A protein has these predicted regions:
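General small-molecule cofactor/ligand-binding pocket signal
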Residues: 69-72
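Acidic/polar alpha-helix N-cap and adjacent early helical turns
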Residues: 92-103
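AMP-binding/adenylate-forming catalytic core of the ANL superfamily
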Residues: 1-64, 74, 81, 87-90
């Protein structure tokens, strides 16, 4: 089933401590791909992952809630100001990110 990254991003930035968010699909051992959300916080005080996921769960169906939250200082953008999901995937790859259920 298709999950809207825009819906997840909008739900995440609704959290008072999140200034920007990007949702992307990552490899999942059972479901082929599942969403995670990458967030930039307003300050150095980062909310707990479950706090963000619980906040998102109020706005989307249970099966759409991302499986993980990754904190970054900034999310890469294209020259036109859009989130560069290609560069974001590269950053996650460079970090050796693995879906939590794959470990």
């Amino acid at each position: 089933e298709w999950i809207s990254s825009i819906d997840l991003e909008n739900a995440a930035v609704g959290h008072p401590d999140v200034s920007e968010a990007a949702a992307i699909g990552v490899a999942h051992p059972k479901w082929d791909e599942r969403p995670i959300v990458v967030v930039v916080c307003h300050s150095s005080k980062k909310p707990e992952k479950m706090d963000i996921l619980n906040f998102i769960s109020k706005n989307v169906a249970k099966w759409q809630v991302p499986d993980d939250v990754i904190y970054m200082d900034e999310i890469p953008h294209t020259a036109t100001g859009k989130i560069s999901k290609l560069d974001l995937r590269k950053k996650l790859s460079d970090m050796n990110y693995v879906h939590p259920e794959s470990e």
